[in-house]
């Protein structure tokens, strides 16, 4: 009897959800912040924290599966891995930014910690 899947479905199929989270993670690595809904921010935080940890440990093949953009891949390994070398975890922070005017969805800004 399966009780919990351990992640939010976000109203999407598995492949669509995985692609969306990978694209959002790439955007966060490139721009260091993204504005999205709170639920998506909480899910993409897991992906980004895992990517930074893998980059710190030098596991580049697993990171290549997620990041398809060469610029983001290079920035992750050259800039972010050295920036967070001494930090054990918690590489992102989520700030709530109110409600979106169009559909009244709760919006959050997810940033990389300095």
Curated annotation (Swiss-Prot):
Cellular component, GO annotation: large ribosomal subunit
Subunit annotation: Part of the 50S ribosomal subunit. Contacts protein L32.
HAMAP family (UniProt xref): Ribosomal_bL17
Keyword Transmembrane annotated: no
Disulfide bridge positions per record: none
UniProt similarity note: Belongs to the bacterial ribosomal protein bL17 family.
Keyword Ribosomal protein: yes
GO annotation (BP), single: translation
Protein name per its UniProtKB record: Large ribosomal subunit protein bL17
InterPro entries hit by this protein: Ribosomal_bL17 (IPR000456), Ribosomal_bL17_sf (IPR036373)
Keyword annotations of the record: Ribonucleoprotein, Ribosomal protein
Domain of life (superkingdom): Bacteria
Family matches, as NCBIfam families: L17 (TIGR00059)
UniProt cross-references to Pfam families, sorted A to Z: Ribosomal_L17
GO molecular function: structural constituent of ribosome
């Amino acid at each position: 009897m399966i009780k919990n899947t351990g992640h939010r479905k976000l109203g999407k199929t598995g492949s669509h959800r995985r692609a969306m989270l990978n694209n959002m993670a790439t955007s966060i690595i490139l721009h260091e912040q993204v504005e999205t809904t709170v639920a998506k921010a909480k899910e993409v935080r897991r992906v980004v924290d895992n990517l930074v940890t893998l980059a710190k440990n030098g596991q580049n093949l697993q990171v290549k599966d997620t990041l398809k953009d060469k610029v983001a891949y290079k920035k992750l390994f050259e800039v972010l891995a050295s920036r967070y070398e001494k930090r054990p975890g918690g590489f992102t922070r989520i700030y709530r930014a109110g409600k979106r005017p169009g559909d009244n969805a709760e919006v959050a800004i997810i940033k990389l910690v300095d």
